[in-house]
Amino acid sequence: MAHTGKLQGPLLAECGEWVWEQLQEEGYQLSGELIDLVFETERELGIQTKSLDEIAQVLEEEFRMRGIQAQPFALDAALIKAILEWEDDFLGFAGISRAES
């Protein structure tokens, strides 16, 4: 499914980099590709307008079904929600609502 929201291209890349930097400062050691995967899967499934808790649960289950794992931190709902919370901050700075993203 083609992504048609406002958060795409260079802005999506900038968001991913910014979120990665914020998580690094919080002590998370994870690759930027993992953040990109969260953003891409969130939009692929069309769930970005749901609550952060619901998105995190859906993505945790989706990644489990796909056999996707992360180390040293588990790719669980708590980590996914942390990514989504920083994404929300970025969206706020960019003046984009989650529904428009």
Please report, for each region that a protein language model flagged, where it lies by residue.
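Eukaryotic scaffold/interaction segments
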Residues: 4-7, 28, 32, 47-48, ...
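Short alpha-helix boundary/capping elements
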Residues: 43-47, 63, 67, 88, ...
